[in-house]
Curated annotation (Swiss-Prot):
<keyword id="KW-1003">Cell membrane</keyword>
<dbReference type="GO" id="GO:0051539">
    <property type="term" value="F:4 iron, 4 sulfur cluster binding"/>
</dbReference>
<dbReference type="Pfam" id="PF12838">
    <property type="entry name" value="Fer4_7"/>
</dbReference>
<feature type="binding site">
    <location>
        <position position="427"/>
    </location>
    <ligand>
        <name>[4Fe-4S] cluster 1</name>
    </ligand>
</feature>
<feature type="binding site">
    <location>
        <position position="417"/>
    </location>
    <ligand>
        <name>[4Fe-4S] cluster 2</name>
    </ligand>
</feature>
<dbReference type="InterPro" id="IPR011538">
    <property type="entry name" value="Nuo51_FMN-bd"/>
</dbReference>
<dbReference type="Pfam" id="PF13375">
    <property type="entry name" value="RnfC_N"/>
</dbReference>
<feature type="binding site">
    <location>
        <position position="384"/>
    </location>
    <ligand>
        <name>[4Fe-4S] cluster 1</name>
    </ligand>
</feature>
<feature type="compositionally biased region" description="Low complexity">
    <location>
        <begin position="599"/>
        <end position="617"/>
    </location>
</feature>
<keyword id="KW-0472">Membrane</keyword>
<dbReference type="GO" id="GO:0022900">
    <property type="term" value="P:electron transport chain"/>
</dbReference>
<keyword id="KW-0479">Metal-binding</keyword>
<dbReference type="InterPro" id="IPR037225">
    <property type="entry name" value="Nuo51_FMN-bd_sf"/>
</dbReference>
<feature type="compositionally biased region" description="Low complexity">
    <location>
        <begin position="571"/>
        <end position="583"/>
    </location>
</feature>
<dbReference type="GO" id="GO:0005886">
    <property type="term" value="C:plasma membrane"/>
</dbReference>
<dbReference type="InterPro" id="IPR019554">
    <property type="entry name" value="Soluble_ligand-bd"/>
</dbReference>
<feature type="domain" description="4Fe-4S ferredoxin-type 1">
    <location>
        <begin position="367"/>
        <end position="398"/>
    </location>
</feature>
Length: 800
């Protein structure tokens, strides 16, 4: 019946599996009051004293700081650190800190000025008027972390369970041997601890607040009960002494009977736990405005001459604490343990600083701790499994840790190990199981970090590929839209350009240009005619009249001029060597119609070509008529006829008489220009008859040439004057449109060049048959040419 009523009581307690009862050894330091020690000559303040990354530096070397001034900036799970006293920053470097690995970390070296001047503080005495988020942020800026040993940021823990907490547990068990820091703190500052509990209750608003304390601390229990008289919501629970009842999951099981699920936090079941020293630091931060810059540290062990609990500033070297505690070293390198005998670690050097999670400095003698025994093989006794409070299999975890079987160790819940050291305490083979577990955890964390970085790199790579694909798709879409928006004319231009590029590769550029551009077509035609002339250097059948009369393209005079110029140039190149007579098509190639400069160039080239002997021109070359609607060309033809007649009169031997048809072919009377030509021819014949007596005297070729030139020039002027008189009548009668002056100048130049070439060469041409009698102009011109050639033939023997 008694057990039934006890089970129904609210103060019911539960038990956890396993656990041990080692010697407590707390009486060495528990009966000595708290004391303060003087500041050291140098404080070494690590930037990372909690679970999380280090903060951003706010100070620099040589800067003077005040007590409580932030040295780093904290955001999220990054806690700031503060100056433990006023002084000057002497260095910021990496130094060995209080960690089992002994690896150096970034630290701030502060030289105290021994004035201990406080900086600006922000107390909140009326904290009930503040909102929970504001209080949590204030706690975060004070740099408060869990002081029980884990070092988890208190503000992060409060934020994580703000709306789900039903039970708030204050851990005052302090179950590990030798450590009495919390015991002395509760004895001397019980009221402040209760105030801290009230602040947490205001922030979390839990249904109940439980303080769990072991029954081996009667004085602390009495002090707390006295302080809780005015706080009915806060309950004090005294639990049996058993190691490790101070573990978070173990104390939750003892006070509530609930177990925290694997891989989850206590907040998932509505329970939040805080250490009693952390609660005291919260009270000092909120009500007094003091950041976490000092804590209570137990100095104990049989080698300590003045053991006890001291207020140690954060960053105080362990060597300074040992000097204050009166260490009596039994050898040159005494054993110094930071923490308790079960969960602590041996320091590699005594210059490491005190940090926020440092609760004890233990210096045992040889009699306290037996000489370490050599490690022996596991005998599979199972004692470790019996005492494990987490209900794990330490033996299997040991094998997996030895064999580097990380997956199996993870599968056997190695992460649930609280590293209490109970398994190593009972191991008969002296196997340091906790050390193996710590090493295996570190390796697993390293593998997890590497896998996480690889996953992040893969995610970045995949995101980059996705971005490139999106950009490519966007470009293709823009190109498609641009292709759709191209007009028909632009599309034709693009297609023509592509066709030219493709045919240029195949050597067909000229054909494509001729097809797509009329100007290029004319140029191609001229090139073709020039090539035909070059091919005509070898004997070939004469071209038909239809070929000779093929007109050049009339749609663009510039194209025609270009084609004619190219044809003449190639014809002159072919004329440098003896070649057969040109065809009719060569004779009717039109001269440039719109450029006097090209005409001048053609005249110069014709003069150069005339320096070498050339075959006599055919009838088609000689009788190519000028256009019938141009009086200037008619005058030029008449002048040429008169010049040839005079040259015949000046010959050494008499030339054969011309027929009546040659001399008396009248031009049609209905055309004044033709009449002028006929008159000029008649005057030339009369002059020849009058000067017949002078033919017996020899005349040089040079004199004949000069006279012919003067006569050609005079006849040209007279014919131009005569033709000009009837131009207006002809234009009015026939409605013809006169062509440009350039054509007349070109025709005149051609006539002069041909006459000079004939006289200078002095060749004896063959008689040339007259053209069809139906064209009076052609007949007259042919007769004049025949007479000039006969005169040259008669003058040649006389010179010899």
């Amino acid at each position: 019946m008694f057990k039934l009523f006890a089970a129904l009581r609210k103060e019911r307690l539960w038990d956890f599996t396993g656990g041990i009862h080692p010697p407590e050894m707390k009486q060495i330091s528990s009966e000595i009051p708290l004391r303060r020690i003087p500041l050291p000559n140098l404080l070494i303040i690590p930037l990372q004293q909690h679970l999380g990354p280090e903060g951003e530096l706010l100070v620099k070397v040589g800067e003077r700081v005040l007590k409580g001034q932030p040295l780093t900036r904290g955001n999220g799970r990054t806690l700031p650190v503060h100056a433990s006293t006023s002084g000057t920053i002497s260095a910021i470097s990496r130094q060995v800190t209080a960690h089992p690995s002994g690896l150096p970390e970034l630290c701030i070296s502060l030289v105290p000025d021994q004035q201990d001047c406080w900086g600006e503080r922000h107390p909140l005495p009326d904290y009930r008027a503040m909102t929970p988020p504001a209080l949590i942020d204030h706690i975060h800026q004070a740099g408060i972390a869990g002081l029980g040993g884990a070092g988890f940021p208190t503000a992060a823990k409060l934020n994580g369970g703000a709306d789900r907490i039903n039970t708030l547990i204050i851990n005052a068990a302090e179950c590990e041997p030798y450590i009495t820091a919390d015991d002395r703190l509760m004895r001397e500052h019980a009221a402040e601890i209760v105030s801290g509990c009230a602040i947490l209750s205001h922030i979390l608003a839990p249904e109940r607040v439980l303080i769990g304390i072991e029954d081996n601390k009667p004085q602390a229990i009495a002090a707390l009960r006295h302080a809780l008289q005015c706080h009915e919501k806060i309950q004090l629970r005294v639990i049996p002494t058993k190691y490790p009842s101070g573990g978070a999951k173990q104390l939750i099981k003892i006070l509530t009977g609930m177990e925290v699920p694997h891989g989850r936090h206590s907040a998932s079941i509505g329970v939040l736990m805080q250490n009693v020293a952390t609660v005291y630091a919260i009270k000092r931060a909120v009500i007094d405005g003091e950041p976490l810059i000092e804590r209570v540290v137990t100095l104990t062990g049989e080698q300590m001459h003045r053991p006890g609990n001291v207020w140690a500033a954060i960053g105080t070297p362990v060597k300074h604490l040992l000097q204050n505690g009166g260490l009596i070293a039994q050898n040159k390198h005494p054993m110094v343990i930071m923490g308790g005998p079960l969960m602590g670690f041996t320091l590699s050097r005594l210059g490491v600083p005190v940090v926020k999670i440092t609760n004890c400095i233990l210096t045992p003698s040889r009699d306290e701790f037996s000489v370490p025994q050599a490690e022996q093989p596991c005998i599979r006794c199972g004692a470790c499994a019996d005492v494990c409070p987490a209900r794990l299999l330490p033996q299997q975890l040991y094998w997996f840790s030895q064999g580097k079987e990380h997956d199996k160790a993870r599968g056997y819940h190695l992460q649930e190990c609280i590293e209490c050291g109970a398994c190593a305490y009972v191991c008969p083979s002296n196997i340091p199981l906790v050390q193996y577990y710590r090493q295996e955890k570190a390796e697993i964390r390293a593998l997890d970090d590497e896998a996480r970085r690889a996953a992040e790199a893969k995610a970045r790579f995949e995101a980059r590929l996705a971005r490139l694909e999106r950009e490519k798709a966007a470009r293709e879409q823009r190109h498609k839209q641009a292709a759709v928006s191209v007009s028909n004319s632009d599309r034709e231009t693009i297609q023509a350009a592509l066709q030219r590029i493709n045919l240029r590769k195949a050597g067909q550029t000229d054909d494509v240009a001729a097809v797509n551009d009329p100007r290029q077509a004319a140029l191609a035609a001229a090139i073709a005619r020039a090539k035909a002339k070059q091919a005509g250097a070898t004997p070939a059948p004469a071209a038909t009249d239809s070929d000779a009369a093929a007109p050049a393209p009339q749609d663009d005079p510039r194209k025609a001029a270009i084609a004619a110029a190219i044809t003449r140039a190639k014809a002159k190149q072919a004329g440098a060597t003896p070649a057969p007579a040109a065809t009719n098509s060569d004779a009717v190639a039109p001269a440039p119609q719109d450029d006097p400069r090209k005409a001048a160039i053609a005249r110069a080239k014709a003069k150069q070509a005339g320096a070498t002997p050339a075959p006599a021109a055919t009838n088609s070359d000689a009788v190519a008529p000028a256009p019938q609607d141009d009086p200037r060309k008619a005058a030029i033809a008449a002048a040429i006829a008169r010049a040839k007649a005079k040259a015949k009169q000046a010959g050494a031997t008499p030339a054969p008489a011309t027929t009546d048809s040659d001399a008396a072919d009248p031009a049609p009377q209905d055309d004044p220009r033709k009449a002028a030509i006929a008159a000029a021819i008649a005057r030339a014949k009369a002059k020849q008859a009058a000067s017949g007596h002078a033919t017996t005297e020899p005349v040089t070729v040079q004199e004949n040439t000069d006279g012919a030139r003067r006569q050609i020039h005079r006849a040209t002027l007279q014919a131009a004057y005569a033709s000009g008189a009837g131009a207006d009548l002809t234009a009015a009668a026939e409605g013809a449109t006169p062509e440009s002056d350039r054509q007349a100048a070109i025709a005149t130049a051609i006539a002069r060049v041909k006459a000079r070439q004939t006289l200078v060469n002095g060749e004896v041409p063959k008689p040339v048959a007259t053209s069809t009698p139906t064209d009076t102009q052609k007949a007259a011109v042919a007769a004049a040419i025949a007479r000039i050639k006969a005169k040259q033939a008669s003058a040649a023997p006389s010179e010899e």
